[in-house]
From Swiss-Prot:
Signal peptide bounds: 1-21
Protein name (record): Osmotic avoidance abnormal protein 8
Compartment annotation: Secreted
One Gene Ontology cellular component annotation held by this UniProt entry: extracellular space
Biological role: Negative regulator of the osmotic stress response. Acts via the transmembrane protein ptr-23.
Keywords for this protein: Secreted, Signal, Stress response
Tissue expr: Expressed in the hypodermal syncitium but not in hypodermal seam cells.
Organism in which the protein naturally occurs: Caenorhabditis elegans
Keyword hit for Cell inner membrane: no
Main localization, broad class: secreted
One example of a Gene Ontology biological process annotation: regulation of gene expression
Disruption outcome: Normal physiological responses to hypertonic stress, such as accumulation of organic osmolytes and activation of osmoresponsive genes, are constitutively activated with mutants exhibiting resistance to normally lethal levels of hypertonic stress.
């Protein structure tokens, strides 16, 4: 920053000095040298080397010779470059449309073009927000109308024998009222219905089975009916009587591959009877053997009076009954 300020300061001083020196042309500048030797040196002329100016062959027009050859090639390269640029731009637009189908420039452009098309009708055009959301609301509006027609037969009013008075106006439902607040074109005036003569048919019931079948079941299930009984014909075989069915049960069992075939016993031998292994003999008691007290019990009984805090204390009565030391001593 100081260097720039110093530079501009010197330039201003030089300009001011040159302006003031215009009135005195005979005055020499301060950097002029009055040495006579320098004036003689300034009179010396140095020879300049001859330089060729212009083309070496001025009569030959190189541009006219090369241009017809190189210009088609240049045009081809330029066209290829433009084509590549157009393909890149188209690929970019396609990727943007796939990633964000509602935020691309082309979609917005088409949307505004559709909105700016002149209408042939004389009715008032709906608002902009309604025209934008109309493609999304039309399917729901159609389904709502169809459902309203189907639900017209369901009522909470009890059935009576008298014919109710026919209504002359139709009122919009709750959803239509809600949508009409944001979309004025959906507002409709109450339509007059021609008065019908009273009929003798009763009013629909609250739980009409046909209505519920039509709402909650498929068409093929609703239209399914019980198959009629086949009519007797000379070509139809009547079913066999019950007695004959009992007789043919053994014959039919032979054709079942998952049951035993009784005819196979003619080609096989009977299996040997299953016998148990012989039981061991009970040893005969020796009358000359001296018994040594009570026999040893196979299962030790647990002392109910056993105290783990005093393991050495034992009940002599229980020890005797269990065949312990007391029993062996007394035996």
């Amino acid at each position: 920053m100081p260097a720039k300020m110093l530079k501009w300061l010197l330039i201003h001083i030089f300009l001011i000095h040159s302006i003031f020196c215009q009135d005195a042309p005979a005055q020499m500048p301060f950097f002029a040298n009055s040495d006579p030797m320098m004036s003689k040196l300034s009179q010396i002329q140095f020879a300049d080397a001859p330089t060729l100016k212009g083309d070496k062959y001025p009569d030959v027009d190189a541009h006219r010779i090369i241009a017809p050859i190189i210009s088609p090639i240049m045009e081809v390269f330029d066209q290829m470059k433009e084509n590549q640029r157009a393909r890149d731009q188209a690929e970019k637009i396609r990727k943007d449309r796939e990633d964000h189908p509602l935020s691309t420039s082309r979609s917005l452009w088409e949307m505004f073009q559709r909105l700016q098309r002149p209408t042939t009708t004389t009715t008032e055009a709906p608002p902009l927000i309604e025209r934008l959301f109309k493609p999304y609301i039309e399917p729901w509006q159609k389904q709502l109308d169809d459902f309203s027609k189907d639900m017209a037969g369901i009522t909470l009013i009890p059935t009576t024998t008298t014919t109710p008075a026919p209504t002359t106006t139709t009122t919009p439902n709750f959803l239509e009222k809600s949508l009409s607040m944001f979309f004025p074109s959906l507002r409709r005036k109450p339509q007059s219905i021609p008065t019908l003569p009273p009929t003798t048919t009763p009013t629909p019931r609250l739980f009409d089975p046909e209505m519920f079948d039509r709402l909650f079941f498929k068409r093929d299930k609703r239209q399914a009916t019980i198959a009629p009984a086949p009519k007797f014909d000379i070509f139809t075989v009547p079913p066999p009587p019950p007695l004959f069915q009992e007789w043919e049960k053994p014959i039919l069992s032979l054709s079942n591959p998952f049951t035993l075939n009784p005819l196979m016993k003619m080609f096989t031998t009977p299996s040997p009877p299953q016998t148990l292994a012989p039981l061991p003999k009970i040893p005969e008691p020796n009358p000359y053997e001296i018994k040594k007290g009570l026999p040893e019990p196979q299962f030790k009984l647990q002392d109910p009076f056993y105290n783990p805090l005093f393991p050495s204390r034992k009940s002599k009565m229980f020890d005797f009954l269990a065949g312990g030391e007391a029993g062996r001593l007394l035996g």
